[in-house]
Structures are given as structure tokens and as C-alpha cells.
Amino acid sequence: MFDNKKFNLKSKFEGFDYQIQTLISAKNLEYAAIFHEQGLGKTKIAIDLGLEWIKENIVDSVIIVVKKGLIKNWEDEIKIHSFIKARVLNNDIVNNHEVFCSPARFILMHYQVAIKEKDRLELFLQSRKVGIILDESQVIKTPDSTLSNTFHDLSDYFTRKLILTGTPIANRPYDIWSQIYFLDKGKSLGESYLEFKNNTDLTNDLHENDLGRDTFIDSLSKINK
């Protein structure tokens, strides 16, 4: 949509081998999940992946959704690892109008902005090719929340999708369902949250059900395929 020649889309620094391998594995996928533990540089991988999407004209822009308190951290990380200046969607309607109308390549916003700006986001996503990266994606683990439903509703409009978290499952295996549903709309873990929950609830016999455990593990293995 916009001339990429005006932007330096190179990464400032080469990643570690495992970061490069993760990037190679994910860059041609319509959706992917990175569940690396904290401290392994998921942010670097995500920024480099966004640059690759833009460089290859797969997307025009990348929206990165983070917890509200991490906006500044991500702005700094984008400056460190790329030559792109991120624009920020926030609670200011005028500011957001300017961002939506700009040729911004990286756009940051915190999760709650999606609820307030859902209608304009939907229009924006129909006007250009957009990739999305959800940082700390466990934020949308509750499938019947307004926040999770907002992202589920917008999901199909994104050209590329990536979720990042070091804790996709805290104490409950079914916490992962909503996050993966955002990516593939039920292809891997099914379209019914209640059915998935009943099959993976640790209060049932999953711990001693070999077939149930194997089915759960097999479902997770399909996420990036």
C-alpha cells in the first residue's frame, strides 16, 4: 500500500541461532505461537518477524498488542532492534485517527484499546494488509470475556498472526484454548471451549488417561502446521 523504499526495514542486530531458526520457521506461516520462556528474546524475534512480513510485502503494517505498562518498553525495544519508529494507539480518539491514516509500519497498542476502537480497527483492517502480534497472549485466555471476544471477532481480518507468551498455561490446560482459537478459529483445539475444557480439566481423569493426554499433546502439535 505504501512505498517501502522510504523505510529502512533491516534489523539492526543479528539474533542468536535459536532466534534465527524460530524466525525462519514462522515467517511463512499464516499464524504461529512462540512459547519461549522469559529471557529468551521473544521480543527480538517478534520485531524481526514483523520486519520480514513488511519487507516481503506480506503485510503493510504490524499491530503489536501489549499490556498497558509495557508500551514504553516495546517502543524502546523497537528502537533498539530496528530503524522504524512505532506509532501508538491509545485512549485519544484524535491521535488514533492520525495513526490509522498514517503509513505507520509498526503500531503499538495496549489490549483494552481494542475494545474501544473495535469498529475503527475493523475498517482499518479492511483498508490494508495487517499482521498482529499479541504479547503476553494469556491476557485473552478467558474465552467469554469482552476482551477475548473482541480479538476473536477481529481475527479473520489479519493477514498474519503471532502470539507470544512464556506462560500459555498456568495451572489449567484449557487456558490455552482462547489463545489458539484467536490464531486458527478452532482448527487445532476445536470450536467448543466447553468440550475442550471438559477433555483437559485436571480435575477429571486426564492425569491417568493415556489416550486423553496423547490427544491433548497431538492437538498442541498441530498449532504451527
Model features per residue range: what roles?
Residues 2-35:
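Conserved pre-motif I regulatory segment
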